[in-house]
Amino acid sequence: MAPTPPSDTTRLRIATRESPLAMWQAEHVAKLLKKHGFQTEIVPLVSKGDTDMRPIDGTRQVGLFTKRIQQALVDDEADVAVHSLKDLPTEPDSRFVLAAVPPRESVLDALVFADNSPHLESQTGAESPLDYLPQGARVGTGSTRRLAQLKQLRPDLEVLPIRGNVQTRLAKLNAGEFDAIVLAHAGILRLEMTDLPHRLFPLDEMIPAPGQGALGIEVRSDDAGAMDAIANLNDAAARLAATAERKVLSELHGGCLAPIACHAKLETSNHGTELCLRAIVMSADGEQRLQEDARITVQPNDADLHVAEAHELGTLVAKRLRDKGADKLISTVRENH
C-alpha cells in the first residue's frame, strides 16, 4: 500500500550538499516523491568535505560529506537526507534509518580525457581505457581504491590526488594538470555529461566502491511519517547489493583509507535467484591483491530475509578476506597515510 501523502501544509524538507551532482540527486528524489503525491523542499548545505580540499586519505575522518547533512535531521532543519551511498559511513547510528535505496545507476568507473585530447586519437581498437595513455601518464583520482587498481594495471602511471566537485576536476584536467582523471560513470550520467571524452573500465579491471552508483535516503529513526513516505522509493535489488557490499566494508573496518572494492548483483540460475558478491582488498601500490567471490540463494517475496542474507554474504566474504590477511594489508595502508 502506498503511503498517505501529508497534508497540503506539510512538506518533506530534503537536505543535500549544494554541489551540482548532489543537487541533482536531491531533485531526483523530490521528483520521485512528487509522483507519490508528496510536496518537497530542497535544503542545500555545505559539508566539511566540500571545503576541506586536502586529499581525503590524509584527513583520517569519516563522514566528511554526510555529517552536516545528518545534523540537519537532528536539528529539524530537514526531514530527509540524500547521500551518495558510497559516502555514507557504515557504522550504525541509532538516530537515523536508511529508509530507501532507489534504483541504482551505473556502478562503473570512467577514464575521462581533456577536451581535444590527443590520446584518444593515438589508439584504435584499444581493449582497455588505459591503452590510450602513454607511458608515465598523469592520472588524477581522489580514491585509494582507484589508485591501487590503476597501479596494478599500469605501474608506470603517475597517479596524483585530485579533489573538488566534478566541474572543478574537469577544469583541472582541461588546464593540463592531468592526462586523464577517473570519475564515477553514475555522476557523468546524472549530470548529462555523456559528451565528455571518456572510456569505461570493465568490471574485471576496476571494481567499484561499496555502494557506488546508489543513493542512500536517510530519515530520523523517530519520524514514522517520513519513513513511510521514503520507503516507497526503495528498490529491492539495489538495496540488497549495496547491503552486501557495505557489510564487507563494515566488517573489515575499512573506512575511506583502505583500498577495498566490492560489487554485488542479483543473478538467476538453476538454483533460483542468487546474490553474487566479489570483493578485493589491495595494497596502495597495487602489488598485493586479495580477492573473494561468493554467492547465496535469496528467497523471493521476503524483504527482511533478503537483507539478512545480504548481511550473511558480506560477513562471509569479509571473513575469507581476513583469513587471507586483509587486516594486515589494511593496517599497512593506514600506517603509510
From Swiss-Prot:
One of its GO terms (biological process) is protoporphyrinogen IX biosynthetic process. Pathway: Porphyrin-containing compound metabolism; protoporphyrin-IX biosynthesis; coproporphyrinogen-III from 5-aminolevulinate: step 2/4. Keywords: Porphyrin biosynthesis, Transferase. CDD domains: PBP2_HMBS. PANTHER family: PORPHOBILINOGEN DEAMINASE. Belongs to the HMBS family. This is Porphobilinogen deaminase. It comes from Rhodopirellula baltica (strain DSM 10527 / NCIMB 13988 / SH1). The lineage of its organism: Bacteria, Pseudomonadati, Planctomycetota, Planctomycetia, Pirellulales.
